[in-house]
Amino acid sequence: MSAKAKSKEILDKDVWAVDEKIGKVKEIEIDLDDWRVTQLEVELEKDVAESVLGAKKGGVRNMLVISALEKGTIRRTDKGLLLQIRKDQLHVYLKPVDAT
């Protein structure tokens, strides 16, 4: 049996890189051809945005490219979403949010 979650169970949940909180889930992007979650829009913590992206302000949102993560690298826990990657690896999986 597969694990399931409703969007409201994921939105605004904390996102952790190994043991450090890096932000909160703000949006979910789904590939409508095969109904897979491909990206999570994460509002990064101010210190994470500064250290990983060089941003000078808080509230920076970036897309976390789920499809680039290996299976089992991300999982849901009581704390939120846990990424089995270090904060210094985040730049590989983040891309700017497209303006709408």
What are these regions (language model features)?
Residues 1-100:
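Peripheral interaction segments used for macromolecular assembly
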